[in-house]
């Protein structure tokens, strides 16, 4: 997986609380088990006025020209609630998002995001309100998300964020669960060599 150390990108504000995984990627698009191809259906029921996904909704933020090419999503509390589908972070990353900034996340979505190199950043509600105001005031507003320094840089302001050291290591080194296991291949082999033959 790609390493994540720092990312600068255009920010799109999704001003809605309790955005669930069915809104992120509706259930009718979950037939595949690969990680690609879901971006075209991200927020499908909000982005499009028709079921076929052919008529964009001009009022939805992702369809507005000022947010074209956005790669950082600014959201409200309890983002990613609902079912545990891993397709939700798949859809976000396939669309082009690298980070989601919100006051809080649903636990399962939060964990799934790290597994898919999507960085979920938690800031206070007051800080989130400040960021929404910044994005509204300046077209093409960009933030820099610095995972190594654990901070979001927005204009001349810096917002530190907390993250579990293990998950930070996981993303900075581009690891998934298999890659993490392979890092300990020698220790695993030594352990297995010490076990009775009938256990191997």
Curated annotation (Swiss-Prot):
Pathway: Amino-acid biosynthesis; L-leucine biosynthesis; L-leucine from 3-methyl-2-oxobutanoate: step 2/4. Pfam families: Aconitase_C (PF00694). Its EC number is 4.2.1.33. Coiled coil: none annotated. One of its GO terms (cellular component) is 3-isopropylmalate dehydratase complex. One of its GO terms (molecular function) is 3-isopropylmalate dehydratase activity. Keywords: Amino-acid biosynthesis, Branched-chain amino acid biosynthesis, Leucine biosynthesis, Lyase. Belongs to the LeuD family. LeuD type 1 subfamily. Catalyzes the isomerization between 2-isopropylmalate and 3-isopropylmalate, via the formation of 2-isopropylmaleate. This is 3-isopropylmalate dehydratase small subunit.
């Amino acid at each position: 997986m790609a390493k994540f150390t720092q990312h600068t990108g255009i920010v799109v504000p999704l001003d809605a609380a309790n955005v669930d995984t069915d809104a992120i990627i509706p259930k009718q698009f979950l037939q595949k088990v690969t990680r690609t191809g879901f971006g075209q259906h991200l927020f499908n029921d909000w982005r499009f006025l028709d079921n076929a996904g052919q008529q964009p909704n001009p009022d939805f933020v992702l369809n507005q020209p000022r947010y074209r090419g956005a790669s950082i999503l600014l959201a409200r509390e309890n983002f990613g609630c609902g079912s545990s589908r891993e397709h939700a972070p798949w859809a976000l990353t396939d669309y082009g998002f690298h980070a989601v900034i919100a006051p809080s996340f649903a636990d399962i979505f939060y964990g799934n995001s790290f597994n898919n190199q999507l960085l979920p950043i938690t800031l206070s509600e007051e800080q989130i309100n400040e960021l929404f105001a910044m994005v509204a005031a300046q077209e093409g507003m960009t933030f820099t998300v610095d995972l190594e320094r654990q901070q979001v840089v927005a204009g001349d302001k810096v917002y530190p964020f907390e993250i579990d050291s293990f998950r930070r290591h996981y993303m900075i080194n581009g690891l998934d669960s298999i890659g993490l296991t392979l890092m300990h291949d020698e220790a695993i082999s030594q352990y297995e060599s010490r076990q009775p033959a009938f256990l191997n």
